[in-house]
């Protein structure tokens, strides 16, 4: 049997402020549950969806590691979740995030593994590697 999808669940400190954070870089609130909300979801496009759980289901917290190119494993001190988000234009997304005052920890860069990427950190410590594939240099 094959999986039909995968939806990460992020432990966040506040559903409403996290939804607002995602909206700053183009995501939309899909739904929330509870009064006040303690669970919800944001989405982008046809397929991308992330569940948000206030204070449960996984870790959160800011580590000292701002990119993936520093320490390994437990030494990194990361408590949040790292995810890759694929977009059409990394540079345009970077401009949008900077204009919205979001924390970009690594600017758009062509990496040796044929991906142009930037890193964006959520206030609860989760890091998003925003990227797109690029042609291999010959």
Locate the predicted segments by residue.
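Vicinal oxygen chelate
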Residues: 1-9, 24-121, 132-138
